[in-house]
């Protein structure tokens, strides 16, 4: 960590099709071994399927799905006097997006559908309907924070 000033985050170029920075970040999360064009084709295919299924615009449906997966609180381990407590802390906005994207991609990869585009489309439509593995993950994180609310005074 720098001592003088905090480092400003790098600017990310918006994606070529929709012009969304959020979608560009999602493409980068999905990308494996630097194959960005493959990741883009998977995501654009999934968004097309999602738009047909929901009847909304693709980007609108994507953002709705992401909103349902974003966590507001999480637990962090804190060692106090020889014992470790799970302390609930609020999640900063950039981390909310990062976690939501990561959870959606992980859930899509674990699905058993035919292609990755179809798996991603199914996971995004489930997330938009407030169900699915990614939403369950968010609920679990919130449940953990709720269960450990008694240790909130250990926050740092």
From Swiss-Prot:
UniProt-listed InterPro entries: Ribosomal_uS7 (IPR000235), Ribosomal_uS7_bac/org-type (IPR005717), Ribosomal_uS7_CS (IPR020606), Ribosomal_uS7_dom (IPR023798), Ribosomal_uS7_dom_sf (IPR036823)
GO BP, sorted A to Z: translation
Keywords (A to Z) from UniProt: Ribonucleoprotein, Ribosomal protein, RNA-binding, rRNA-binding, tRNA-binding
Pfam families linked to this entry: Ribosomal_S7 (PF00177)
Tagged with keyword 4Fe-4S: no
Domain of life: Bacteria
Gene Ontology terms for molecular function: rRNA binding; structural constituent of ribosome; tRNA binding
One Gene Ontology term, aspect cellular component: small ribosomal subunit
Family assignment from sequence similarity: Belongs to the universal ribosomal protein uS7 family.
Summary of subunit composition and partner proteins: Part of the 30S ribosomal subunit. Contacts proteins S9 and S11.
Its job: One of the primary rRNA binding proteins, it binds directly to 16S rRNA where it nucleates assembly of the head domain of the 30S subunit. Is located at the subunit interface close to the decoding center, probably blocks exit of the E-site tRNA.
Protein name (Swiss-Prot/TrEMBL): Small ribosomal subunit protein uS7
Organism: Actinobacillus pleuropneumoniae serotype 5b (strain L20)
Lineage summary: Bacteria, Pseudomonadati, Pseudomonadota, Gammaproteobacteria, Pasteurellales
Protein encoded by which gene: rpsG
């Amino acid at each position: 960590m720098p001592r003088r000033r905090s480092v400003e985050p790098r600017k990310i170029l918006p994606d070529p099709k929709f012009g969304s920075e959020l979608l560009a970040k999602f493409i980068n999360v999905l990308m494996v071994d630097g194959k960005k064009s493959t990741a883009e084709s998977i995501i654009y295919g999934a968004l097309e399927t999602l738009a047909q299924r929901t009847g909304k615009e693709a980007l609108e449906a994507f953002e709705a799905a992401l909103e349902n997966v974003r966590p507001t609180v999480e637990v962090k381990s804190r060692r106090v006097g020889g014992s470790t407590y799970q302390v609930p802390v609020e999640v900063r906005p950039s981390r909310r997006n990062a976690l939501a994207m990561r959870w959606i991609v992980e859930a899509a990869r674990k699905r058993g559908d035919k292609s990755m585009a179809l798996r991603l489309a199914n996971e995004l439509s489930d997330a938009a309907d407030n169900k699915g593995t990614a939403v369950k993950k968010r609920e679990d994180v919130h449940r953990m924070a709720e269960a450990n609310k008694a240790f909130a005074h250990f926050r740092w």
